[in-house]
């Protein structure tokens, strides 16, 4: 019996349906464009946040942009791989793990700069703790329950209900509308994932 850990490559994991070459190229290219956009936006966002709101905002926004960069990059690589490649499953695990990172990353600037205090730090701990758990689950579980993963994604996404009062008092209708639109589109998208 070996003591070394291995990636979850169990036959219980399945790749999504095989897409056409054109669909895979389109997915890979659009996600690569998103990754490059995040690289361009990283210094701009960090400098703007630091100049306007201070170092805490710059750190939070940098975490947000880096998390989106990682999500887009992993997805671009995943879709660029041949469907029959032995590495495709590992890339699928990484690609789906980046969803956790993107969700936690999107909460980080809000929790640090808008909410702050014990509630903000509690949200950060919950988000990043769930991210670590979710990634370890994807890597090491003997059988992946996609509905459980979906539950974790949705739970993380809708933790916003606990910080709505802080957000409402510190932002305006445009921010509320964007958050609501993002949450609803994310939830509708999750239905397709399931």
Cite the ranges covered by each PLM segment:
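Multi-pass alpha-helical transmembrane bundles in non-GPCR membrane proteins
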Residues: 2-194
